[in-house]
């Protein structure tokens, strides 16, 4: 029965990767994804799909992985000591797309499943995932519709989920060392196992299936907008924050590196270009200042 859990989730995730890659390539119109299949020496493997130098997407990746092993890594057992001594299977789809035009937001989505087993004991399993948006020059319409799509997806399972997962996202995608949010949020959840397997599985299916509905209309609206070199420079500066979050705070990155995951695939979320500038300050009253002073503050976007 429990092996069937893994089989069902893995099948869905591989289909999801196919569907998302097809739709993102269509939105780009110039480049398609190149697949790099890999095997993990300790058990498992995956399919990393990368797009570079597209008409819309400067670089991005959509990865599927299924890894397994005899011992849970420290990043997974730190907040769940009962997992010590269990073998594990972990599978997921994770993506980050970095558009070239600063008017188009960077986006991240992830859905994942863990199951940890020990002979003679009930397995421990859970789901996690979510999606979040990181604009550089935000538009209220985009942010509101993004959150509305997230709410619609979760409401199809349980209307209590969106407020909880929205707040969790605001809390998780936060750079503590900068005291600022990574973006304008979305939804995030982890350790989901407080209802039946089928109900929990339906949550990640709702999230996975909603991603392109939420993101692609934003891409279509913004991909042909004009921008200046100054705006491009600001985008690269803000991408630096993305790098900082992924390397310092992101639990998924740490899990991948600690389990001996494939470094190229784990770090495919990195932007192709980013920049840092010592003590840079935005002009008072500028769009750049408005990003941090207004947009990167947690707020109820569906009541704006």
From Swiss-Prot:
Q: What class of enzyme is it?
A: oxidoreductase
Q: Which residues bind substrate per the record?
A: 94, 110-112, 260-262
**What keywords tag this UniProt record?**
Cytoplasm, Heme biosynthesis, Metal-binding, Oxidoreductase, Porphyrin biosynthesis
Provide the residue span(s) of the region labelled Important for dimerization: 242-277
Question: Where, per UniProt, does this protein localize?
Answer: Cytoplasm
Q: Where is the major localization of this protein? A: cytoplasm
Disulfide bonds, which pairs?
Answer: none
User: What residues make up the catalytic site?
Assistant: 108
What GO molecular function terms would the record report? coproporphyrinogen oxidase activity; metal ion binding; protein homodimerization activity
Residues binding a divalent metal cation, per UniProt: 98, 108, 147, 177
Tell me its family. Answer: Belongs to the aerobic coproporphyrinogen-III oxidase family.
PANTHER family for the chain: COPROPORPHYRINOGEN III OXIDASE, MITOCHONDRIAL, OXYGEN-DEPENDENT COPROPORPHYRINOGEN-III OXIDASE, MITOCHONDRIAL
So what does this one do? Involved in the heme biosynthesis. Catalyzes the aerobic oxidative decarboxylation of propionate groups of rings A and B of coproporphyrinogen-III to yield the vinyl groups in protoporphyrinogen-IX.
* Protein name, UniProt field: Oxygen-dependent coproporphyrinogen-III oxidase
Organism of derivation: Idiomarina loihiensis (strain ATCC BAA-735 / DSM 15497 / L2-TR)
- Primary gene name: hemF
